Design a protein with these regions (language model features):
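C-terminal motif of bacterial Sec signal peptides marking the signal peptidase cleavage site
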Residues: 25-28
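Structural signature of WD-repeat beta-propellers
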Residues: 132, 162, 171, 178-179, ...
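WD40 beta-propeller blade core
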Residues: 138, 184, 224, 269, ...
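Blade/loop signatures of beta-propeller domains
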Residues: 40-59, 65-102, 278
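Bacterial signal peptide processing site
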Residues: 30-33
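Short loop/turn segments that connect beta-strands within beta-propeller blades
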Residues: 141-144, 187-191, 227-231, 273-276, ...
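Extracytoplasmic beta-rich repeat domains
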Residues: 102-122, 150-168, 195-210, 233-255, ...
């Protein structure tokens, strides 16, 4: 079954490939211009090429002549939740063609052997909020990066090894889920604790906030729904427990009166936000793969609700597009990934487990183009695997950040690489964009702002 393209949200389209570049060198404290002209001399230093890697997915030759059209970029004032909004659908964001590094700040403890940074930064108006690998939450001025407040939410009575969680902001509150099995509501202006809710188990993903409710998923596959004003539990849903899983977890997606919750078991369910009644359920764990790791069916990438179409992808190699209201499948594809798909107009962009950046048609899941990405720092020896975060569509380019210290820019129209950022450290989480600014958090615990 193929669903028609919903027409509820008006879109203005732009045709063709725009030759914009995302080539920026960041080394220590220095940053060069973004460039892309063929006649310019190359920057010094080691290059990691976009490989001619033929394993995996292929573009559909029958749609090779389809012109990729995108909505016009718009300025989003906020990136207040994981994925940008409660529905995780941000479309095409505005970002200048030549952003410069304007400031950087220390968010706290970075990723290491014991704890990892899992929280995306969130941006609301003139403030950026972050959380480090040990539940240290900070607020920074978005214009110059000065710290406004900082609060340590680590539970001193707990053993080492409890980390993860994330943050979301709504109105005058910041909501924090921690690996210490606590959900906090903080005053957005001061960091003062307003309420604390003790969860039944730790959390590895960020909360999502919508219509007076906080939605958060625990490590043992329960979704808690809390009142934003009091922290009181309104209802909860219990999924199938899973003993094996990936680091981190996906946040639910919310639109209208429906929440789509992903679990590490591969379950994806649509529930009514009022009382938790099930609208429909799917399982993304039944594609059999030769790779034993693919047996982990976890839905690690955030599900997306794009104009009443739910997009969900699992690590086990299955992607579904499902009607939000009826639960009817629009299409399914044998594609695995752990990053959030990015929806824009008639197309969907995603990074696969096999290190490919893919453009799909929204209406039927057919592949318009595929770009192989570097998979190892040392490709010849296949050592030091690269983990890619993203993509984000901003300023007519797809931006993906690597764990090896480079950020790539790729054309959304044909998949051709446009350039790279050479960071001094790898990206811990996917980049975020708000108010014409790009924000990156590194494994070393640095927040970098470019505009």
């Amino acid at each position: 079954m193929i669903l028609p393209m919903p027409s509820r949200m008006p879109l203005i389209f732009k045709r063709g490939l725009l030759p914009l570049s995302l080539l920026l060198a960041v080394s220590g404290c220095g940053v060069t211009d973004w460039f892309g002209k063929a006649e310019d001399p190359p920057l010094p230093g080691q290059r990691i090429a976009i490989l001619a890697y033929e394993r995996g997915l292929r573009a559909d030759p029958e749609i090779a002549e389809v012109v990729v059209q995108l909505p016009e970029p718009y300025v989003n004032a906020d990136w207040a939740q994981p994925g940008g909004s409660a529905a995780h659908a941000m479309y095409h964001l505005s970002l200048s063609a030549n952003p410069r590094r304007v400031w950087s700040a220390d968010v706290g403890e970075g990723s290491g052997d014991v704890a990892q940074i899992l929280a995306e930064p969130v941006v609301v108006g003139d403030t950026v909020y972050t959380m480090d690998s040990r539940s240290l939450v900070s607020a920074f001025a978005a214009d110059i990066g000065t710290r406004r407040w900082q609060v340590d939410l680590e539970d001193e009575d707990e053993d080492d090894g409890f980390f993860g969680g994330g943050i979301a902001a709504d109105g005058d509150k910041v909501f924090v889920a921690t690996g210490f099995a606590r959900v906090f509501a903080l005053d957005a202006a001061t960091g003062e604790t307003l309420w604390i809710h003790k969860a039944p188990s730790p959390m590895r993903g960020a909360p999502v906030v919508s219509d007076g409710r906080v939605f958060v998923v625990t490590l043992d596959n329960q979704m808690l729904v809390l009142n934003t004003e009091t922290g009181e539990r309104l209802w909860n849903h219990v999924g199938v427990q899973e003993t094996a899983g990936l680091l981190g977890s996906a946040s639910p997606a919310v639109a209208r009166n429906t929440v789509v919750v992903p679990y590490s078991s591969g379950e994806v369910l649509a529930l009514l936000t009022d009382d938790g009644r099930t609208v429909w359920s799917e399982n993304l764990s039944d594609i059999r793969r030769l790779d034993p790791l693919a047996d982990i069916a976890q839905v690690r990438g955030l599900p997306v609700i794009d104009r009443d179409l739910v997009l969900a992808i699992s690590h086990a190699g299955r992607m579904l597009a499902v009607d939000l209201r009826q639960g009817a499948r629009a299409w399914q594809a044998e594609i695995g990934g752990v990053q959030m798909p990015w929806a824009a107009g008639d197309f969907i962009y995603l990074v696969t487990n096999d290190g490919q950046l893919v453009c799909l048609q929204r209406r039927d899941g057919r592949i318009r183009w595929v770009t192989p990405l570097p998979r190892f720092v040392d490709e010849e020896a296949q050592e030091d695997p690269i983990r890619w975060r993203g993509p984000v569509l901003a300023g007519d380019r797809l931006i993906i950040a690597g764990s090896h210290g480079e950020v790539l820019s790729v054309s959304p129209y044909d998949g051709k690489p446009l350039g790279f950022i050479a960071l001094g450290d790898g990206a811990a989480v996917a980049p975020v964009v708000a108010n014409n600014s790009l924000y990156l958090v590194t494994n070393g615990g640095e927040l970098v702002a470019l505009r």
